[in-house]
């Protein structure tokens, strides 16, 4: 008798047989995020004219986008994931990513010009804006990289596995498979100066290839070489003298990370305030809504530094609960990837897994001072409506991988019974 699987019986938008656990943990994270966005933002919203002096301004925006994202997730979960395997879909996704990245170049027209569809902040042009709709270009690019890399691995992977040694053909296929991640990441980094998102996009492609490839020794060597280069770079930067204006804000951020108290009034101010927030929270925190650091110390506590407010208000216990929810979310995605009926579905789920895991690790590393400030948000928790929508679309893809894989297993079981 077939093993009874834990699947939902929801019929919303025809979604029968979806992974209940993944849906529930996603809902918990969204609700947790809404609570923390309100707690972190209500003070600033209530005293800011741009927010209409409405303490619930950002909460209402985030709640609306979360609802839109959940509808999009359920809709995408009804689309057979093999649709994303069609060549024209892959090419369209990559072409659209390139086009949206090129739109960022309209910044040359200057702020306020009708032909400028980009927004620049802190030295990086990350956003495109069409009317009242704005979003980070990196978000759709991440989806395009996941889809394109999955398609290439599915198309060329079987061919590469047959080769016993790293021949020229092997390297050529490897370059082709890594091209979407590395290529689009480099293109985005050059055009937008958004190096943190570019790094995430490139690593997503590499992780997907590493997760699939049976010959892992070369990747361990590459990782060691990369770590060594980063170490040398940090050492060289730490030995230099004062930072010149020409060196740019990125190098300044690295210097501020290495020696935060020399930059405590400018570049390191937010990072140090975040550490004070984390340290003052203790085991159980000051209580929801009782943060002191959000009262002007941390400029935008509802964005990429929201984890520090979680620690201050809910303490180690609250932060641990949040991390456990993320771990369980990643576990569900990993489980779906392992049980996918084919390589393409497995790679789709792996790509989403790597995206979420990378952002969680990088965000918490920045907030705790383990990395320089990158501007990477905490998935489903930080304020950011369009980022939430795109991430929920990715989770919709994962839900469909589980749905169709389970359907295929059920069909195989029925066929076995009739034999």
Feature names for model-found ranges:
Residues 199-218, 292-314, 318, 377-389:
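Interfacial segments of multi-pass membrane proteins
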Residues 34-37, 73, 146, 150, ...:
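Alpha-helical transmembrane segments of polytopic integral membrane proteins
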Residues 27-44:
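Alpha-helical transmembrane segments of multi-pass membrane proteins
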Residues 89-95, 175-188, 195-242:
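Hydrophobic alpha-helical segments of polytopic membrane proteins
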Residues 19-26, 88-93, 343-351:
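Membrane-interfacial loop-to-transmembrane alpha-helix junctions, especially the N-terminal start
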Residues 316-360:
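Hydrophobic transmembrane alpha-helices and their immediate junctions
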């Amino acid at each position: 008798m077939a093993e009874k699987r834990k699947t939902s019986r929801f019929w919303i938008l025809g979604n029968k047989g979806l992974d209940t656990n993944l849906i529930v943990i996603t809902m918990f994270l969204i609700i947790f995020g809404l609570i923390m966005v309100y707690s972190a933002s209500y003070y600033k919203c209530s005293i800011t004219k741009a927010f209409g002096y409405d303490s619930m301004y950002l909460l209402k925006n985030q709640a609306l986008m979360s609802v839109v994202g959940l509808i999009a997730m359920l809709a995408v979960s009804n689309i057979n994931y093999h649709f994303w395997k069609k060549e024209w879909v892959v090419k369209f996704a990559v072409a659209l990513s390139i086009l949206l990245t090129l739109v960022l170049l309209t910044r040359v027209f200057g702020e306020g010009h009708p032909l400028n569809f980009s927004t620049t902040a802190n030295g990086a042009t990350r956003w495109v804006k069409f009317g009242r709709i704005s979003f980070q270009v990196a978000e759709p690019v991440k989806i395009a990289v996941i889809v394109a890399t999955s398609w290439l691995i599915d198309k060329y992977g079987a061919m590469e596995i047959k080769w016993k040694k790293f021949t020229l053909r092997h390297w050529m296929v490897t370059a082709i498979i890594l091209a979407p991640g590395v290529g689009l990441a480099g293109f985005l980094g050059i055009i937008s100066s958004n190096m943190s998102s570019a790094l995430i996009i490139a690593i997503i492609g590499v992780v997907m290839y590493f997760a699939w490839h049976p010959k892992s020794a070369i990747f361990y060597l590459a990782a060691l070489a990369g770590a060594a280069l980063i170490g040398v770079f940090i050492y060289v930067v730490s030995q230099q003298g004062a930072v010149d204006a020409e060196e740019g804000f990125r190098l300044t951020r690295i210097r501020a990370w290495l020696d935060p108290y020399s930059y405590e009034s400018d570049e390191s101010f937010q990072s140090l305030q975040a550490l004070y927030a984390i340290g003052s929270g203790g085991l159980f925190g000051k209580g929801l809504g009782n943060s002191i650091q959000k009262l002007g110390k941390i400029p935008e506590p509802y964005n990429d530094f929201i984890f520090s407010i979680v620690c201050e208000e809910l303490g180690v216990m609250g932060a641990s609960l949040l991390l456990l929810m993320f771990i369980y979310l990643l576990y569900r995605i990993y489980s779906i990837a392992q049980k996918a009926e084919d390589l393409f579905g497995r790679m789709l789920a792996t790509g989403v897994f790597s995206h979420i895991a990378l952002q969680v690790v990088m965000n918490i590393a920045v907030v705790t001072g383990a990395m320089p400030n990158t501007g990477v948000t905490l998935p489903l928790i930080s304020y950011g409506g369009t980022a939430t929508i795109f991430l929920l679309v990715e989770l919709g893809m994962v839900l469909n991988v589980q749905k169709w894989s389970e359907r295929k297993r059920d069909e195989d079981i029925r066929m076995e019974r009739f034999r």
